[in-house]
Regions:
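Basic/aromatic-rich interaction segments and small domains that mediate binding to polyanionic partners
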Residues: 2-57
């Protein structure tokens, strides 16, 4: 699965958010909003369960 900047993904832990930066083919900065604040963790391909929206298709 190819992940691009601005794709929306669902993580295995249930969070959903947008890819805001792609470091390489396996590491990304992920923007997730929770009840308290905006978080920008770095995630890897193994954290991603599915792509729910592809920027290239819109």
């Amino acid at each position: 699965m190819k992940i691009e900047e601005l794709d929306v993904v669902k993580l295995k832990d249930g969070r959903e958010g947008a890819i805001v930066y792609r470091f390489d083919d396996d590491h990304f900065m992920f923007e997730a909003k929770d009840d308290y604040d905006l978080k920008l963790p770095t995630i890897s391909m193994s954290d991603i369960e599915e792509v729910t929206w592809k920027v290239s298709e819109h």
